[in-house]
Amino acid sequence: MDKKLLFIVNPRAGKTKSSAPLFEAVSIYSEAGYLVSVRQTRGRGDATVLAETLGADCDLIVCHGGDGTLNETINGVMRIPKEKRPMVS
């Protein structure tokens, strides 16, 4: 059975707007046996909601964004019961 990975992406973070690095990362994780799901944030607080609502069913959450996106992702993960919390990268 594949491991599940949630990619939380803030498309507004960073200076480059290219999606090439994201596609490359998704490909690498897929080849490593992960079933990858990509979700984009649209506004403040979205990463928290995504991590909390979708993270408990995942083995790993990868945060692709800036400090704020990472902070929100961690906040969402910490709302998941300890025994169901995924790793965060």
Can you say where each PLM-predicted feature lies in the sequence?
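Small-residue-rich beta-alpha loop regions that form the catalytic core of phosphotransfer
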Residues: 2-89
